[in-house]
Amino acid sequence: MDAHTLDQIRWGLLSLILLIISIGLHEFGHAWVADLRGDPLPRAQGRVTLNPFAHTDPIGTIAIPAFMIFLPILTGSPAGFGLIGWGKPVQISLLNPRTRRMDDILITLAGPSMNIVLCLSFALIGGLGGFHFNDPKAASVVKFLVSGVFLNAGLAVFNLIPIPPLDGSRIALRLGIYTEEMFQSLARWGFLILLVMINISVVRSVMGDVIEWLAAPWFMLWDLLL
């Protein structure tokens, strides 16, 4: 195994760790806001914690992302699929009928919002840490932090797509864009729809543009802090 492949494996491992942390904090966001809104279920199930492994799904957070990251590296083939990953869903009870709609919207938005907070965090570390983008001595750290910004911008954008089981679909349901029947019909085919979508070049191109647009302000902040 040559040095280039070993370097790719090393960055693949770092990418997987970054994904586990980012998905874990995304799910923590849901649990934390549910707890703030008076829902006892996430705390009772041990989900109001920053420990990412409390939010890890063995298949969705580790196995499938690892397969998609490392298969192209080990086989030398181009990556044919977008990276798919998910955490253990946070269960909520929405006990208060008077605030149920708003509670659900706020709890749902908390996940992507946490990813935006992570974008900010990586940018602050880069800027306040004095890690210049073109400094060869800081290349590895910069690459990791840049990956953190892009990954979390991607998670925020992807999760707001209004297709079940993504967060955007619950927001669409609560805003009346979907009826309950429409939501349930989409939910039956949601995973397949998403799998097809992320492998359509036009869709991937548009999503890439949106992700870059969302990531750009954080890189500007990073640069301003240097």
Segments predicted by a language model, with ranges:
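Hydrophobic transmembrane alpha-helices and their immediate loop junctions
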Residues: 1-226
